[in-house]
Each structure stands twice: as C-alpha cells, then as structure tokens.
C-alpha cells in the first residue's frame, strides 16, 4: 500500500488533523499536516492506541448475506422462463461485556452448586431413614429375645421347685406357656417387619416423588431450550455467532440439549442434480402420530326407515366394502348405492358390533299432522253420495236430472271419464254427489270414490241387469263398508224386468227390503224424472240414520278427488272438504305437493272464499299436480309443509327404486330365458290425473310375453316439445288424451316424423294400441303343399345331372319352389326345384295329369318310385 498524506488519513478516520498530529506525537512520531504517513507508522499508531485504551475490540458486528437462485416460471405463451431471485439478509450481533459474562457464569455455578447441595441433602436423608429402620428392627428383635429368655428362666425355676411327677395339668400348662411364648415372639417379629416395610415404602415414595419432580424440571428445561428462536442461515460464521449468543442467553439448559438424531443429519447437505448442495432441512417441531385403538370402537348408529349401504358404512366409520361383505355373509346381495330397509340395516350394524338406535323419519310429518287435527264442536254435515254402476246405465243422466243441467253432453262419447263432484241444494237439505266412470279402465277412480263417500247409489239399467262393472261397484262399496242404495234406471224402456234385476243382485248379497233384506231399492227414470224425489228422500233418510257429523270450524282436511295441469292457471286440484273450513290463503299439504291457496272455485266455476265440510272445490296454487286420492291438510307453517312434502317425495322415490331393484332381481333369470321381447314405447299425456292413471293401468294390462307396453313418459297437460324430443329419441308414439300439442311440439313432430295420436274416448285408445302391438308380433309361417309328382324314370343330363321323369298326380308343380324328395313316405332330401321341362320346353308350371322332367338342385340320387313334393311357405299375421 502506498504512503498517504496525514490530511487524507484524517479524512478517512473522520478525525481532525490536530488530534491526529497529537496522537502521532504521543506515539513518538513527529508529524505535520502536510507530511506523508507510511504503513509502518500507521501500525505503530494503532498499537499505541490499543495499549492506551486497553486493547478493546468491537462490541458490535453486522453480517450481510446475499443468496441467489433461479425459478422456472411459465409465461403467457406456456413456455418456461428463468427468473433470477436474489435474497438479502442483514443481522447485527452485539458482544456482551466481561462483567455480564462473569455474572452469568457465577449465576450458573451458584445454580449448579444449589442443585448439588439439594441432591446431597436428600441422599443423606434417605440414608438416615434406612439406618433408623434397621436400628428399630434390631431393637425389636433384641427385646423379643430377652422376653423369651425370661420366660425360659421362670419355667426352669418352676420345674426346680416342683420335683414331683408331672401331672396332666402341668403338661397342659407347659404347652400353654410354650404357645404363648411362641405367639409373643411372632407378634414382635411381625411388628418389626411391618414397621420396617412401612419405613422402606415411605422412603421409596419420597424417592419416586423427587424423581418425578426432577423429571418434570428436566422436561421444562428442555422445552424452554427447544422453544428458543433459532436463526438458520447458510453462513457458517453467522451460525456460529448465533449459537454462542443463544447459549449465553439460555444458560445451562442449552448445554443439556440432546444432539440431533442421525436420521435428520442423514439428509442434510445432499447434492442436487445440478451439483449444488441443498440447504439443511429444518427439523419440524410439530409431530403427529396415529395410535391404533386397543379395542373395537362401539358406536351408536341411528337408522331410519330406509338407508343406503354407503350411508350405513359412513355412520359406522367403516368402508362400504366391509358392509357389503357382511351382507354377503348373511346371504344378501347389495351394491354401494342400494337402499336397504330398517330391519336389514339393524341386523348388519349389530353383526358388526355397534349399538343401533331406531329413528322415525316421519317425526316432523306426524307432528304437523297432529297440529292440524285440532278438536272442536262437531255439527251435522251433508252426506257425500257416490253414483256407481256399469257404463251407459244412466249414472250421469240421473245426476244431470237432479242438477237440472246437461252434464253428460260435455263428456266425450257420452261416457264419464272424470270424477265429477257437485253439491245440490234440495228442499230437505244439501247433498254432495260424486259421479264416477263406469268403464273397466277406471277401477281405481271408482275405488277412490267409494272411500271418500258416505252412501253409494248403485245404478242398474232395468233392461240390461247386472253387468261386470256393476259387480265391481258392489265389491268397492263392501270394501269401504258403505251403505248401498240401488237405483233401478230406465224403467220407462221396453223390456224392463225388475224381478230379474233383484234376482241377479241377490246373488251378490244385495237383497231388497221387499224380499226381507237391508238394501233400499228405488225405481227411477233419468229421462223423465220418475222416482227421483223418492231417491233423494231415501238418501237423506239413510244420512239421518248414519248421524253424519264433522268439525265445522278449524283447519280443513279433505281428499283430492281429481287433479290436472291447466295451461293458464297451473296445477288445479279438485278437493272434497271433509272437516273444518278451507279458506283463501291457507297453506295446503296434498300428498307430495304443497302450496298456498291462491284461488278457489266451486263446480260451476264461480270463485268462493270459504268451503265447509262436504263441499267440493277446485284449488289453485299448489307446487305441482297431486295424485288423485291423496289427503289434503291445512298446516300452519309453510316451511314445515315444504319439508314434509320433500320428505314424502324422497320416500316415494326410495320405495320406487327398491321396488324396481326387487323386480330386476326377481325377473333376472326369466328375462335371460325369454330372450328378446318386442317393446311398444309410448309417451302418454292426459287432461287429468285420474284418466292418466286409468289409461296407464289399462295399457300395462295389454302386455304379453312377446310384446310389452313400455310407458316411458307420462304427465298431465298438453304435449310439449320435451315430450316430442323424448318420443323421437326413443322411437315412441305420442298419445294425447283430451289434450293437444303446442306449436313447437307440432313442428318437431313433423320434422322428426314422430307418430302422434289424439283420443277423446278410452275405447278407441286401447283398440289402437292393441292393433299396434299386433303389428309387433312375430308372424307365423305355414307350409302348404302345392303339388306331388311320382318319379317314373331317371335320365342323365351332362349339364344338370340326374333328371327325374315324373307324372304330376296332385296339384301343380311350379319352378323355383322348395321341394322334398320322399322315399317310402320318408323325407330324404329337401331343396329347390332347379329345372322343369316338358318335351324340351322350359315351363314355369305343370298341372295335374301331365308328364314332365324335374331337375333337383345339388341332388343326383333320385330313384324310380320316389315322390317329389312341392310346397310354398305362407306368412300368417297374428293378432292379440
């Protein structure tokens, strides 16, 4: 290093020139501000200043660390791009003074000395306790020995004093004294041993308590040591400085810290593929471990009425495969998403060692229904009368005369296809009527009518007598345990035979009062009106005998008679109120649907606000089209009504899936044996729910082993574009019963060529479907013999082979027809007639009594006396 001026040195050292000149003078070097300063002179000055100030070193040190790394980052184009990352760290370390270090060391020595003194005192206390216990044991033993010696001496003196022969009493006394002596010795020894054991146990307890306390203190020291703030850096100097600093701050507990496990050191400083060393891994302070349960865990499993296999496994905290295995061991096959009943789930859970708690899923439903069933004052109500009978026996005409309105004209074909609900005011009171269909397809609708009624009027035509639907109506009335009034209609027609009607009805236990029975018979004419007043009187008389009553005030309850989807008004339900009052704004729960009553209309279409018992009304505002026959109940809370409806929908779906699964398993082998079955796919739309249900039931009954009716889509309301798309995709025919397709659906049906049919009478619908099913039946084939020829001679042809010279004995022989060669009435060959000639001319056919030459294709073994039988196959169409 070159010499520099004193002025420049003063600037570098941040000192004035006068102070620097004075310091050089004190060091024995004379300098002025303009003089040069050599390296040796600088060292001399530095040594002088260090001696003068005691050689103090720096108390503060600042370390700076800079690390660079490269990151590969994907850019917007998707290509990798290298990014340089530089991390800078700066730490300052302050050196403690010697006095602080000495104080820390003195404190450490004092703590260590105190711990050693404490340990020594405890050891001395233990020694004293043990020595004391031994001394007490020796003293007790010595005392027992002295007592024994005294007793022996006393016995000896007694023996010396008494020199006579020992008596039996003396021997007994000697034995007693010996036993007493032995007992005293044993008691003394036991007492000494007990005291010694007690003292040893106390000493051991003291040692254990001290050991536990020392272990806790040691653990606390270790935790305190491990809880320190360590600064991990890649610089060795900085790490060493931090270790020294931390050890001084933590004291002796730092020295007792264990070394790192070799497993942790194993992976430190590994080289990567690029050759650079990785940073040492920081040991994780958080350690977690799973301990296997010592015994199987018993859980409380809550099981409802239905549950899937996956849900059951989740509640038992096991895999679904384990549940399936357990079910297979018990002989039940199941899949992970299959719904199983409560009983099966209970058996499986108990088999797997869990406690089962059975729950009712319909608790909310029961609570809501209990709230709705409020008691009140019961008052008399009007009777609900259902008119039943065979088709075209005059049920609707009779009701029409009673209502003084033409109802039958509104029904297509003059037959009733809906349940009509009406109430009639008479001079003697009000009567509510339900008019049911008489056709065979409407069995379920008649059944609903019988269940919702008080009295059944059985209409029987005087000229027809008892018919199949008449018998069915009698069965429905008996099943519902409803009184039955027979109305013999059409008494004004020729051929009316009352006795015949009575006789036929008596075969079904319907006996008139005239013949000593219980059933009321009335004779009416719906056309003229004869006997109608007597019928009404009979109805009211029967109602008085039944003493009909209902709660007039309070929440309403009833039954859904019919339902439909109106294009402008939405879901419409016809409800017969049975209890309470149904008002506008009430929250109504109908089976799977719910909603607020937005509007109510009577049977004439007039708006009303309140409907009491035995009044049929049309209700608007439900969430969907309810099923006919569902119970309708007014509830207080709309939220609860929605929850109950959703629960019922889920339950209905589960039951439906379970039934389908059962049907699949039951019919699996039957389907495998049956092979291919033709299917007629149908998309069915009807105007009301009852008609839809009746048509579906009738169509399903048409299915046979060879042709199956598959209703892939059904609904209430007009034919929509969705229905047309479904039919197009599945190759189905679209049937509309009293409904029409909208514009978009008609366009799609026309473009896709979907088969669309409209019907207003159920007879025509069923006949058309039956005809379509007949077209799907596989045709039958029958073989018909057209001619027989006897072989008289056999010729050889170089081109064809054997030619049979024949005489046609029956029918006509036609060329290219299939033939059979018979020898002694046994078929030996079946083939095709290839050549047919007569006098070298090729002919298309040869009639009876003519000779011809016949060449059989691929057959040369024709002999004289054989018969050639010519036949044709005729296709015969089958019908259901």
Curated annotation (Swiss-Prot):
Residues 389-396 are annotated as: G1. Residues 525-527 are annotated as: G5. Its main location: cytoplasm. Keywords: Cytoplasm, GTP-binding, Initiation factor, Nucleotide-binding, Protein biosynthesis. It comes from the Bacteria. Residues 69-78 have a biased composition (Polar residues). Residues 380-549 form the tr-type G domain. Residues 435-438 are annotated as: G3. GO terms for cellular component: cytosol. GTP binds at residues 389-396, 435-439, 489-492. Signal peptide: none annotated. Residues 142-229 have a biased composition (Basic and acidic residues). Residues 269-279 have a biased composition (Basic residues). The keyword rRNA-binding does not apply. One of its GO terms (molecular function) is guanosine tetraphosphate binding. It is found in: Cytoplasm. Residues 414-418 are annotated as: G2. The keyword Transport does not apply. Residues 489-492 are annotated as: G4. Residues 51-78, 93-116, 142-293 are annotated as: Disordered. NCBIfam families: IF-2, small_GTP. One of the essential components for the initiation of protein synthesis. Protects formylmethionyl-tRNA from spontaneous hydrolysis and promotes its binding to the 30S ribosomal subunits. Also involved in the hydrolysis of GTP during the formation of the 70S ribosomal complex. Belongs to the TRAFAC class translation factor GTPase superfamily. Classic translation factor GTPase family. IF-2 subfamily. This is Translation initiation factor IF-2. It comes from Psychromonas ingrahamii (strain DSM 17664 / CCUG 51855 / 37).
